[in-house]
Amino acid sequence: MKPEKHSFVVDRRSFLRQSSVAAAGLGIGAIPIIGAEKEKKKPEAETLVKTFYDSLSEEEKKAVCFPFDHKLRLKIENNWLITKKLVEDYSKDQQAIIKEIFMGIHSEEYAQKVYDQVEWDSGLDGFEGGSSVAIFGTPGTGKFEFVLTGRHCTRRCDGDSNEGTAFGGPLFYGHAADSFNEKPDHKGNAYWYQAVRANEVYQMLDGKQREAALCGKSRGEKGRATVKLTGKKNGLDGIRVGDMSGDQKGHVRKVLADLMAPFRKKDSKEALKLVEAGGLDNIHMAFYKEENIGKDEIWDVWQLEGPNMVCYFRGKPHVHAWMHIKKPV
């Protein structure tokens, strides 16, 4: 696993993109094209995975393609490259397909924000120089999975090849926005809104409930073991959602919705369906007082865990988030 790093130098590519965004905000170049055709529907990410696979040379396939059941497929870390071949090592057309796959597995609302986060956290390397991909199985002929990794990024596209598994397997996302050691307000962090919502639940709890929800130290980060599912309905960290009032439960649902918001609708819908199958009441919500930034009682580290799901949000020193959801056993 590569050590965490951060660069505060804005590369030319990022600068140009930010400049174009600023220009758009000022109305520059915003004149509509009369008679422009309606934008064609974009191909599904799974279709693009096959297109990308078909474009690979035999040499490239040897470097980045593996059997579907290869142990590397379900590996997860906070900062790693799944193969040695970087995105920038592919042809420009292939790079464009990879980016389109990445954008396609995220929601329209968040896709650009998430891409910008990965670009930023990759420093001078950018998305192309800081990311790598692998394909497991053979797209178009059976089970397959496309995996893209980098700093603060493990994303999957499997076309539902992994039945009963949300997002094709465990996910990781994160962001070091303003600095490696973020301040309590996590200025500019793409995912801090999720913690804000979670802390709203804490504020709704009464004294006894807060006592149950507040814990010492969290599970910490241990690669794939971080998202190991226990199958337990009781004895987990924090307060059981089944012990909450109706309005408190409703806010937990909002937390879950926020956790799913960055991802495309069909994947988020499947994930929430699996969470409900395990029983909302069986989920436990925990906040970790020994890992907080500042003394504001806005908890930076928290989690939701049930028998068939875990969403671990580690907001210190910056945001790392781990998610794994499966069909209940």
Give the positions of each predicted feature:
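N-terminal secretory signal peptides
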Residues: 1-14
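Short, polar/charged, Gly/Pro-enriched helix-capping and turn/loop motifs at alpha-helix termini
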Residues: 22, 29-30, 112, 266
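Detector for intrinsically disordered, low-structure N-terminal pre-sequences
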Residues: 8-9, 20, 33
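N-terminal export leaders
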Residues: 12-28
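A cross-kingdom marker for long, charged
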Residues: 39-58, 62-329
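Bacterial Sec-dependent signal peptides at the C-terminal "C-region" and cleavage site
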Residues: 30-39
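Low-complexity, intrinsically disordered short peptide segments enriched in small/polar/basic residues
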Residues: 5-7, 28-31
